[in-house]
């Protein structure tokens, strides 16, 4: 319990530092705009390119479309919520696939030697080229009455980016137990499944938690980029493109969508932080290092 409280306390301190960093960025933003009026800078600091911080926040209350009852804030909140569902769906699929691959590669050495190079090579494919390919293939797929949609393509791309760090981290964690512990389990006639669940998985937690964080971040990035690439509507990625078209008349509006994407990432990070506390609450401090 004390270990959990200590981790929560450290998390609170980290949050305060993060808030201080946000305030510092806002101050530097405004100082840069002021400096741009005094001397010539190598980039544009006009209100068209760099709106004031208060202009960005006032854009939250603007109607999304002239005459509409829906505010920009409501539209961004709905889009971020939709993207969150897609990102978490892709993240879950990526975690399951990554864990299965890690277990198979740990259990069978020839699979590790054969699969690992392909797992690594899979991440060298440019996402911008992969998205249209997945959409094109997906349009030919149907499961009875269920037709593949671009929503599934977005989740697939998110899972594609999420599975790699999880599979590598899980594989390293499953291989972490020292030979003495493995020999002790085998001396008790423990089966491979017993060793997996009672020794390898607990030993892999310090490796799994960082891998989960990277996978979650990759799933969010994959979701936003896939929404832009595939043109799926309703998500924060597509909303940023739509608001970017209005930069001439409302330059601050696009930043509201960017704030929505940032908030999406922070929510996912908070979810993973809660999972982190849950998984590591009983680990000794040495295991958390």
Predicted regions and their residues:
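Generic hydrophobic transmembrane alpha-helix motif, especially the helices
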Residues: 120-165, 172-173
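Periplasmic/extracellular loop-to-transmembrane helix junction in inner-membrane transport proteins
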Residues: 37-92
């Amino acid at each position: 319990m004390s270990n959990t409280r200590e981790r929560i306390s450290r998390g609170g301190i980290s949050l305060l530092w993060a808030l201080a960093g946000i305030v510092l960025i806002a101050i530097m933003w405004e100082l840069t705009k002021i400096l741009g009026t005094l001397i010539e800078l190598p980039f544009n600091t006009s209100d068209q390119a760099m709106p004031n911080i208060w202009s960005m926040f006032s854009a939250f209350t603007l109607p999304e479309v002239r005459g509409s009852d829906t505010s920009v804030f409501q539209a961004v909140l709905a889009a971020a919520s939709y993207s969150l569902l897609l990102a978490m769906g892709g993240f879950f699929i990526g975690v399951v696939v990554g864990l299965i691959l890690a277990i198979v590669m740990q259990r069978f050495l020839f699979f590790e030697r054969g699969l690992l190079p392909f797992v690594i090579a899979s991440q060298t494919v440019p996402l911008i080229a992969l998205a249209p390919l997945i959409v094109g293939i997906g349009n030919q797929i149907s499961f009875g009455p269920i037709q593949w949609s671009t929503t599934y393509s977005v989740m697939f791309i998110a899972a594609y980016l999420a599975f790699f760090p999880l599979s590598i981290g899980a594989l390293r964690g499953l291989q972490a137990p020292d030979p003495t512990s493995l020999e002790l389990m085998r001396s008790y006639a423990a089966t491979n499944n017993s060793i997996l669940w009672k020794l390898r998985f607990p030993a892999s937690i310090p490796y799994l938690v960082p891998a989960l964080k990277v996978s979650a971040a990759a799933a969010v990035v994959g979701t936003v980029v896939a929404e832009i690439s595939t043109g799926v509507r309703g998500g924060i990625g597509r909303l940023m493109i739509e608001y970017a078209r209005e930069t001439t008349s409302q330059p601050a509006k696009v930043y509201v969508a960017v704030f929505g994407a940032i908030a999406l990432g922070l929510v996912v990070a908070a979810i993973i932080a809660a999972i982190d506390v849950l998984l590591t609450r009983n680990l000794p401090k040495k295991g958390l290092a």
